[in-house]
Amino acid sequence: MSTLGDKESIIFKEKSFGGEKWSLQNGSRYGNQAGALRSLKVGKFCKVNIWDKNGTMQTFLGGEYPDITDKLPNVDIVQAIDVQFKYSVDIRFKHNVQGRDPNDFKLTVIPYQLNGVEIVSGGDYSGVQIPELNPPDSEIVCQISIREIKWPGQVFANGSIYFKYTPSNNTVSYRKTEGWPTNCEIVQDDVSGFTITLKSI
């Protein structure tokens, strides 16, 4: 574990840490289309949630796991988070604004009483990490805002949305209210992943 960062996890294609490997920092995720992950190393301050294609979810704390195939034979999604959090809402952001580059805008998501996460349009998923709530299936409200990255940094959307973790099936869902900005849409991609799109400015 000496070469593994405290906030880093490494997933491997073969058992006993062999074959191709991928490094994950806390707040990131890996979507494995082939289902071919067989072992992993988890940093001291990390927690890794892994879903199998059959819906099974397993959490791994800091340590080495040379063979995960008995519990997760066909890995689907790998989510790396800080150890003090329970789950992550994985969000990617894009836009449909004509004449603008894919990465012209920035989405900020701020969960209630937590630090915000900034997500540039056109990129991969970023994790909005959520602690365990009481009760565990409580909703948490998140403030969202979208602005252009270039000067003058004009704001084009402001609003809020609710997310909820369901322990019985280890999935994250969302609920829109009147606070959701009308020029945006959100689509649920999988058990923890969502795409937010800025439709117009």
UniProtKB/Swiss-Prot annotation:
It comes from the Eukaryota. Induction: Expression is controlled by rpkA. Gene3D superfamilies: Calcium-dependent cell adhesion molecule-1. It is found in: Cell membrane. InterPro entries: CAD_C_sf, Dictyostelium_CAD, Membrane-bd. Coiled coil: none annotated. Pfam families: Membrane_bind. Its main location: membrane. One of its GO terms (cellular component) is extracellular matrix. Keywords: Calcium, Cell adhesion, Cell membrane, Membrane. GO terms for biological process: calcium-dependent cell-cell adhesion via plasma membrane cell adhesion molecules. The keyword Ion transport does not apply. GO terms for molecular function: calcium ion binding; calmodulin binding. PANTHER family: CALCIUM-DEPENDENT CELL ADHESION MOLECULE 1-RELATED. Mediates calcium-dependent cell-cell adhesion during the early stage of development. Belongs to the Dictyostelium CAD family. This is Putative calcium-dependent cell adhesion molecule 2. The lineage of its organism: Eukaryota, Amoebozoa, Evosea, Eumycetozoa, Dictyostelia.
